[in-house]
Amino acid sequence: GKEISYNNLLDIDSVIRLVREFPGKIAAAIVKHQNPTGVALGSSAEQAYRTARAVDELAAFGNVTAISSTVDEACANAIKETFVEVVVALDFTDEARSILKKKKNLRLLKTDLVLPVDLGIRLEGRTLAHGMLVQQIDNSLWDDFKVVSKRKPTEEEIQALEFAWRVVKHVRSNSTILAHPDRTVGTGPGQTARVDSFRIAIEKAGENAKGAAAATDGFCFADSIELAHNAGITAVIEPGGSMQDNETIEKADELGMALVMTGMRHFKH
């Protein structure tokens, strides 16, 4: 394929970080402009990829994909159905290579970085007009998993909440992810108003918002809880620590929703 661009490399980094969140599982993540259009688990590479792509078929056009296993013939046939810029995977079978090499602009990257290997890298940085910022890489998940609502989340809701929280940490704040236990269904990335990230995620999810869990990296106020409930979302996970926490908890209890606070905001910028 053609040369890998600067933007491709940024998306490659983002998509690798996403699939590394799910050790021991077959995960697929699809990224555009460093934000996930879909993330999913599956019993095979093909199933994980198809599920991730189906989250938002329109946004997935021209994406960068990562799969935390070997891409086989079935998965390659699925990938070739649409325009993909780059596929990053643990490996590619000979049959998969033969299929995908016919896509002249597609780049294939084989790497074990899709697995949660410890690279020994602890810092990351960004350049500024007047210097550089350096910080520790955010390898944590949460400080706590505290159920603050009267209703406790079900086991299925807990799985969906964790899935959503693992993804939302990689989305620019203010962000919201809607998810079921094995896949995202809606992404609301990088909004200046936290409630707008909820609205966008709900709009993207459509009917799939019903029964989903929501993870938000911004403070979740009562208006977001009500918006989520009206869309059929049953459980929410958020950082907590706002002066309006009590109002948020009261609204969740009023609506019979499960609410979890993590004590940590990933606050990706």
Predicted segments, located by residue:
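ATP-dependent carboxylate/acyl-activation modules
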Residues: 1-269
